[in-house]
Amino acid sequence: MTAKWEKTSGSQGVLTYEAPAEAFDKAVDAAFKTVVKDLNVPGFRKGKLPRPMFNKMYGEEALYQDALDILYRDTIQGAVEEAGFEPIALENIDVDGTLEKGKPVAFKVTFVVEPEAELGEYKGLEYEAVSTEVTEDEVTAELEALQQQGAELAVKEGAIENGDTAVFDFAGFADGEQFEGGTAENYTLEIGSGQFIPGFEEQMIGMTAGEEKDVEVTFPEEYHAENLAGKPATFKVKLHEVKTKQVPELDDEFAKDIDESVSTLDELKASIRERLEAGKKQEAEGTMRDQLVEQATANATIDVPEVLVEQEVDRMVQEFGSRVSSQGIDLNMYFELTGTSEEAMREEMKEQAEERVKARLVLKAIADKEAIEVSDEDAEKELEEMSKLYNIAPDQLRTMLAPQGGLETLKGDLKFRKAIDILVENGKAK
């Protein structure tokens, strides 16, 4: 078998190869064995029609399409490997000439392939520098957030105020009927958190323990339960307890409780400042790299096939599904709660997906032009660093990465990172 690959455009080409006659004959035999299983012919048991009788009744040509499918399936991988290219998607299959038993079959197969980016300027690009200075207000805000995290709830005498926590029973009624999912006992709610529908929490302000009240609200038009959307409702509320936050004092003891490595509040503040600075530097580095990749991509010329964009959208939907799944929600539930659909999400993701594909192709072109190489040793070193970062044994991490391509995928990521490093080394702040 002699296979030849010829590109016809930036993202498409034709593979031509000839499958030998004996391979086609075997495929015809295999097709007969498959087809005859389902044949019901009077005078013969199901699946037992002799081959000569089949040929007489239907003609051997009736097997050729199935045989062609079998032959293609059995030969295409070898032809692709011999021609030395990597297809992304199948576009079309043609056969030159007439199919005939005892003769070779000449395939002409059109594939979509990854296009090559035509690079523009990618060195000497300018980026907007981001300040990494940490202000005193930012340190104070972080300190107060830690203080709030250490707060404890204590029972409070008197009326509910915004920010207090209420423990109460409620039962919801619409059109005079109690509705499903609108009842709870000893429910805990922070007033002002916005967890309940608009107007509910505000009407609880001023209530005291033991008080009962009818809370009148209207469900939003876009509420996920269609039978309640836009309807007025009454919630019968009985308040059991009012709790308020008691925050710890900002002193040396508080500092030691938060961070065992410090002894005083001033040391904690210094530690917070150092952490915030490190975070800002990392964020600034990421922003700079993103800006440079965006510019290099904008300067390049790329013909991105639709199939690549759709594949990237598939990845993005999968990534999003994994994120919401970690919060205990599957995608179908998410679509129901938000009133959206997968089709709408995919359409919204398309533009970003295309930009991601373009950026990847540009970085690949830069890596090729700059002759960037990533060795197995580089990948192993990166694996070691990742195992330390995520506190996972290297072998376990290797197993987890295997379905995504393992070390080869890791090497590809490293190559892209090195390509961005070249943009950074040759870039400059405005």
UniProtKB/Swiss-Prot annotation:
Gene Ontology biological-process entries: 'de novo' cotranslational protein folding; cell division; chaperone-mediated protein folding; protein transport; protein unfolding
Keyword Kinase among record annotations: no
Major place of residence: cytoplasm
Residue ranges of domain PPIase FKBP-type in the record: 163-248
A Pfam family this chain is assigned to: Trigger_C
Protein name: Trigger factor
Family annotation (PANTHER family): TRIGGER FACTOR CHAPERONE AND PEPTIDYL-PROLYL CIS/TRANS ISOMERASE, TRIGGER FACTOR-LIKE PROTEIN TIG, CHLOROPLASTIC
Reactions it catalyzes: [protein]-peptidylproline (omega=180) = [protein]-peptidylproline (omega=0)
Role of this protein: Involved in protein export. Acts as a chaperone by maintaining the newly synthesized protein in an open conformation. Functions as a peptidyl-prolyl cis-trans isomerase.
Entry's free-text remark on domains: Consists of 3 domains; the N-terminus binds the ribosome, the middle domain has PPIase activity, while the C-terminus has intrinsic chaperone activity on its own.
Cellular localisation: Cytoplasm
Gene it is expressed from: tig
Record-linked PROSITE patterns: FKBP_PPIASE
Record's GO cellular component terms: cytoplasm
Alphabetical keyword list: Cell cycle, Cell division, Chaperone, Cytoplasm, Isomerase, Rotamase
InterPro entries documented for this protein: PPIase_dom_sf, PPIase_FKBP_dom, Trig_fac, Trigger_fac_C, Trigger_fac_C_sf, Trigger_fac_ribosome-bd_bac, Trigger_fac_ribosome-bd_sf, Trigger_fact/SurA_dom_sf
Family, as annotated: Belongs to the FKBP-type PPIase family. Tig subfamily.
Organism phylogeny: Bacteria, Bacillati, Bacillota, Bacilli, Bacillales
